[in-house]
Amino acid sequence: MKVRASVRKICTNCRMIRRRGKVMVVCTNPKHKQRQG
C-alpha cells in the first residue's frame, strides 16, 4: 500500500474507489495499491 498525496491509475486494471472518505486505487497487481493521505 502506497500512501500518496495524489493517487492515479498506473495500469488499465487499476480502479479508483472511495472508502470511508479516502480515495483509493485497487488493482490486480498488489504493487499498484494506493491510498490518499
From Swiss-Prot:
<dbReference type="GO" id="GO:0006412">
    <property type="term" value="P:translation"/>
</dbReference>
<dbReference type="GO" id="GO:0003735">
    <property type="term" value="F:structural constituent of ribosome"/>
</dbReference>
<dbReference type="GO" id="GO:0005840">
    <property type="term" value="C:ribosome"/>
</dbReference>
<keyword id="KW-0687">Ribonucleoprotein</keyword>
<comment type="similarity">
    <text>Belongs to the bacterial ribosomal protein bL36 family.</text>
</comment>
<dbReference type="GO" id="GO:0009507">
    <property type="term" value="C:chloroplast"/>
</dbReference>
<dbReference type="InterPro" id="IPR000473">
    <property type="entry name" value="Ribosomal_bL36"/>
</dbReference>
<dbReference type="InterPro" id="IPR035977">
    <property type="entry name" value="Ribosomal_bL36_sp"/>
</dbReference>
<dbReference type="GO" id="GO:1990904">
    <property type="term" value="C:ribonucleoprotein complex"/>
</dbReference>
<protein>
    <recommendedName>
        <fullName>Large ribosomal subunit protein bL36c</fullName>
    </recommendedName>
</protein>
<keyword id="KW-0689">Ribosomal protein</keyword>
<keyword id="KW-0150">Chloroplast</keyword>
<dbReference type="Pfam" id="PF00444">
    <property type="entry name" value="Ribosomal_L36"/>
</dbReference>
<keyword id="KW-0934">Plastid</keyword>
